[in-house]
């Protein structure tokens, strides 16, 4: 419980800092695409869940996060089958008004490329014109930054966040 509380507080702090630095933001008028890892049931005890920390946190998001998240629901989003997850995210989120994206750069890169291809557009702002913030962590974004700048189509804000267990 304290782990979850700590991560949710970190998320609230990050969004509060963003809002303070960008008071005219429309971040909270749209949806937030959050990419997570996968979950598994422990065969020794079905009540025990094992998996990536991002998936465990997303499974227990508070209501004030859940109603902004795209896509909604948890099943396919935490699937071990990356292709199933990727297809679901891209198909569902393409229709939403995404303002924020959060996740590991390599995962987000695949999602963005797929959505651009599926919608036959030049950049992601043709699909999500209000996209303004990319929250990233898990690995350094430096090697991905030129790709994202090209795929996004216009400047956005980047906020880096690392758990105590992560580094680069």
Can you say where each PLM-predicted feature lies in the sequence?
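Active-site phosphate/ATP/adenylate-binding loop shared across adenylate-forming ligases
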Residues: 1-168
């Amino acid at each position: 419980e304290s782990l979850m509380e700590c991560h949710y507080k970190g998320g609230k702090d990050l969004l509060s800092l963003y809002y303070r630095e960008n008071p005219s933001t429309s971040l909270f008028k749209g949806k937030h695409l959050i990419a997570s890892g996968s979950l598994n049931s422990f065969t020794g005890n079905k009540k025990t869940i094992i998996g990536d920390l991002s998936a465990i946190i997303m499974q227990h998001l508070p209501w004030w996060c859940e109603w902004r998240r795209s896509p909604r629901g948890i099943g396919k989003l935490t699937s071990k089958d990356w292709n199933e997850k990727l297809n679901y995210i891209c198909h569902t989120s393409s229709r939403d008004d995404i303002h924020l994206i959060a996740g590991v750069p390599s995962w987000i890169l695949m999602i963005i490329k797929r959505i651009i291809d599926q919608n036959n557009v030049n950049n992601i702002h043709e699909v999500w014109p209000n996209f303004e913030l990319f929250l990233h962590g898990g690995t350094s974004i430096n090697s991905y930054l030129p790709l994202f700048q090209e795929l996004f189509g216009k400047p956005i804000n980047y906020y880096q966040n690392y758990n105590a267990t992560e580094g680069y």
